[in-house]
Amino acid sequence: MEHFIEFRHVSKTYTMGEVKINALHDADFVIDEGELCVIVGPSGAGKTTLLNILGGMDTLTSGEVFVGGRDISHLGVKALTAYRRYEVGFVFQFYNLIQNLTALENVEMATHISHVETDAAEILAEVGLADRCRNFPAQLSGGEQQLVSIARALAKKPRLLLCDEPTGALDYVTGKQILRLLQDTARKTGMTVVIITHNSALTAMADRVVHVKNGTVERMECNPAAKPVDEIEW
């Protein structure tokens, strides 16, 4: 069976003057389509480097990365830009919203670069912000801003949603709301969702868990009994 995502012996080395930093070494893992995968590890483990390579925002030093059967590790600049634009949605810890645009306008920006027609207002309603769509980011809570960020990512109808510490700046209750939405997105749409976190408690919600430490993939686990977010405590 072909996996949707395959990392094959991926290494990444950064050079700073005469110093070489090995951010990743011989990383191997797979993710199937429609899974919610949690990549977990301490700060500096290499999680974000993995995410950046998977999202086409960084290149690898050696190895191969396949997404949907295509080797993205050797794409040219134009093809890699198209991959990021059309196939991947991004959600970050800090929401990166444009402050002088309303919530609706922030989401509409994503629809303008998508090759799939979507209704920004409808997507905001799906994440529970129908009555906040005319508000500016400064008028929204942190959780609401993150919901706008997720709506913006979903507006592109990506095959792959990448989330880097999506609850890191949020309180416990709001963080659970965000994680519930991400879990529901994978379950209901068949979208592949990847969450980067240092919080090992979140592994219970995942279909697949990739443990990263010191730039290596220590182990990968499948979880046939993923828990609903509401049943997880930390």
Question: Model regions: which residues?
Answer:
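ABC family nucleotide-binding domain
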Residues: 3-212
